Amino acid sequence: MHNELKQGYENIITAVGEDPNREGLLDTPKRAAKAMEYLTQGYRQTLEEITNNAVFTSDADDMVLVQDIELYSMCEHHLLPFTGRCHIAYIPNGKVLGLSKFARIVDMFARRFQIQEQLTHQIAKAVEEVTGATGVGVIVEAKHMCMMMRGVEKQNSSMRTSVMLGNFRADPKTRNEFLQLIKG
């Protein structure tokens, strides 16, 4: 994969009229290929690998919230970055997930070519699958470079998406508790 990506970046540099052998660009295809491999490593990870058996038996049955998980992803339409934060809440049903695993779940799905709507859904379904929670709520807030750097060039715009599963969808009180908690 690395050599194919490297060649692709050399082609892009040439196509825009630059010299890939110019001093400042000489190692750029190699560096860009390495960066792209990292930014898309979510395709080569599984939920089982990243959660690594960090699901623990627990009597906890009240809402658990992990807030402000930073994320970096690539829009599938323009291959430009979007950055933001994710808030995840769930109601345990006999099992809790190790805290760092929430960030790993976010990263696994964010490190793919994505749209924010799908990313939010994938995170929620993964938390539900791993924990067996009676409810999951996920909110993602992000700024999209495809809207800020090109097109309409709106630098202050942001997008917010949410997915509510189980109790978070069925019970307005649960959903409102989640929304109030993330407001601080």
Curated annotation (Swiss-Prot):
GO terms for biological process: one-carbon metabolic process; tetrahydrobiopterin biosynthetic process; tetrahydrofolate biosynthetic process. PROSITE patterns: GTP_CYCLOHYDROL_1_1. It is an enzyme of class 3 (hydrolase). Its EC number is 3.5.4.16. Transmembrane segments: none annotated. Zn(2+) binds at residues 75, 78, 146. Pathway: Cofactor biosynthesis; 7,8-dihydroneopterin triphosphate biosynthesis; 7,8-dihydroneopterin triphosphate from GTP: step 1/1. It catalyses: GTP + H2O = 7,8-dihydroneopterin 3'-triphosphate + formate + H(+). The keyword GTP-binding applies. One of its GO terms (molecular function) is GTP binding. One of its GO terms (cellular component) is cytoplasm. Keywords: GTP-binding, Hydrolase, Metal-binding, Nucleotide-binding, One-carbon metabolism, Zinc. Belongs to the GTP cyclohydrolase I family. NCBIfam families: folE (TIGR00063), PRK09347.1-2 (NF006825), PRK09347.1-3 (NF006826). Toroid-shaped homodecamer, composed of two pentamers of five dimers. PANTHER family: GTP CYCLOHYDROLASE 1, GTP CYCLOHYDROLASE I. This is GTP cyclohydrolase 1.
